[in-house]
Amino acid sequence: MAEMNFGGVVETVVTSKEFSLEKAREVLKNETIAILGYGIQGPGQAGNLRDNGFNVIVGQRPGKTYDKAVADGWVPGKTLFSVEEAAQKGTIICMLLSDAGQIAVWPKIKQYLTPGKTLYYSHGFAINWNDRTGVVPPADIDVIMVLLRVRAPRSAQCSLRVAV
């Protein structure tokens, strides 16, 4: 593990040396990873996880990014759902919506953040400024931040690091 300083706060970061892909597959084999949002980060993270053998679903509202998800192989009613339904079905809820989107959808999905679930962020405006946004996770769920290290253009391939 590595100690990293994030804006004056030292965090212990689990790297791929301590937590291999094989170990991740074993630990997460019974989890459903719900990617909420298929805009900037959604396609890369969802595709990376799916291509590496994880159980992934996508939550996206109808529109051009929904159509892109279908074109990318996500199947409506099977692996592609509304944001609310994906939040309900997922055990790991990945908030990859825009900052404004996270704030707007929060009242609709917070009821699905039940004990034992994990809320996952890749950017933290809404949760860090929760006194202004109203995004306050329940005390009985885990909250994590996943930082991406991009190895290819447009997030075609990503290496994930988890800050816990």
Place the predicted regions along the sequence by residue:
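NAD(P)+-binding Rossmann beta1-loop-alpha1 motif at the extreme N-terminus of oxidoreductases
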Residues: A2-V75
